[in-house]
């Protein structure tokens, strides 16, 4: 939440929605942060559903009813976007046929263990080889579940977030690709 509010982007152009399906004490921490940032003039809301139905896709589907933005940036709770993120990514949407901008990410804990090193290597391969090849070939790039920005119209035209899947990112990506 702090990282999103620290983005180098005009505050009046952002509508920040914290989708919180947690069932532990983090809810109070989120509520306090949201209250603090509202006091600083941020358009920020803490959205809790009465159910966890559909998990992440369910939360995203629910939130789409309340967004007033043309673009929807999605960050998982463990993602820390760099301050320049929106300033570098949003200009790609100047082309009206762009529905998704998927950004690469780094690793804060890459050297923590052999497992995190292997995960970092795998993700680096995905970004540096697979997605680079797709981009250079002008092929559609899939949404990786976080660190991506969607044109809201693209989500809507593709049928929105479906909750009967555990891979909501790929599901929406493929439906958007089939729609053109």
Mark where each language-model region is.
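Cell-envelope/extracellular polymer assembly enzymes that use nucleotide-activated donors
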Residues: 15-17, 156, 171
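Long helical/loop segments within the catalytic core of UDP-sugar-dependent glycosyltransferases
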Residues: 32-71, 83-166, 177
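Acidic donor-binding loop at a coil-to-helix junction in glycosyltransferase catalytic cores
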Residues: 166-172
């Amino acid at each position: 939440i702090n990282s999103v509010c620290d983005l180098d982007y005009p505050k009046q152009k952002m509508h920040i929605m914290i989708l919180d399906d947690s069932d532990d004490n983090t809810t109070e921490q989120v509520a306090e942060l949201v209250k603090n940032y509202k006091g600083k003039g941020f358009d920020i809301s803490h959205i809790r559903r009465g159910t966890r139905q559909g998990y992440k896709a369910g939360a995203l589907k629910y939130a789409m009813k309340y967004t007033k933005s043309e673009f929807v940036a999605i960050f998982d709770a463990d993602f820390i976007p760099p301050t320049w993120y929106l300033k570098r990514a949003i200009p790609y949407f100047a082309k009206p046929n762009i529905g998704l901008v998927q950004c690469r990410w780094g690793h804060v804990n890459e050297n923590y263990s052999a497992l995190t090193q292997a995960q970092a290597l795998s993700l680096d391969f995905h970004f540096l080889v697979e997605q680079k090849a797709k981009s250079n070939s002008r092929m559609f790039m899939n949404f990786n579940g976080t660190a991506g920005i969607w044109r809201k119209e693209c989500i809507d035209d593709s049928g929105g977030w479906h909750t009967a899947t555990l891979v909501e990112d790929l599901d929406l990506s493929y439906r958007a690709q089939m729609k053109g």
